Regions:
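Short, surface-exposed beta-strand-loop junctions and turns on beta-sheet-rich folds
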Residues: 74-76, 137
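Mature exported/compartmentalized surface modules and terminal targeting/interaction regions
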Residues: 1-3, 81, 85, 89, ...
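A positional/architectural concept
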Residues: 2-67, 72, 79
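Functionally constrained cores in energy, signaling, and assembly domains
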Residues: 14, 43, 70, 74, ...
Length: 175
């Protein structure tokens, strides 16, 4: 059996969904995905398009193929539109969470052992959703506030995330 590859380069077309949703994605053939020899159902990679800044993402199954969603910000950064053939470099994502851990949240978890246990008891996908949510604000005070809100939410809801409730809690004023 061949060794799993750490990096794969290929060309593919940036495709727009035919449903009218506006979603743009890269189609990845199953033969390319097979080169990574993923061991679990989660297929996380770091993707670079046309030599642009790399981003962490999932290879999402779609019949016999896989796809990677490419949002407008990333399309604009590399100057591509639907129909463009692009150079793609995929590297197997071997990071702990599949997204960077915001520094502020890491510090909150370090200081709050109960919050740390509750966060790490969540499924990998829920952890990534929280990390993505907490990495969005540019303001450091808001990132700290939101990290504290998330930990409080976990404690108040027996380690569960109740999406609608959490989103409302995140809107409350800091002071």
């Amino acid at each position: 059996m061949a060794k799993p590859q750490k990096q794969v380069k290929f060309k593919t077309e940036l495709t727009i969904s035919s449903t009218g949703s506006g979603w743009h994605f890269l189609i990845v053939e199953k033969e390319i995905v097979a080169k990574f020899q993923f061991e679990d159902k989660f297929k996380r990679v770091v993707c670079s398009i046309n030599g642009g800044e790399a981003f962490q993402c999932a290879l999402l199954p779609w019949g016999e193929l896989f796809y990677i969603i490419v949002n407008k910000k990333k399309r604009d950064e590399v100057g591509v539109v639907a129909g463009d053939v692009v150079d793609v470099v995929l590297v197997k994502d071997e990071s702990k969470y599949g997204l960077p851990m915001p520094e502020e949240f890491e510090e909150v978890l370090t200081q709050d052992t109960e919050g740390d246990k509750l966060f790490h008891a969540l499924g990998k996908g829920k952890q990534r959703s929280i990390l993505y949510l907490l990495s969005r604000p540019k303001d450091i005070d808001l990132r700290i506030h939101q990290a504290l809100v998330v930990v409080d939410h976990l404690k108040e809801n027996e380690g569960k995330i109740i999406d609608k409730v959490l989103y409302e809690e995140l809107k409350r004023p800091m002071f």
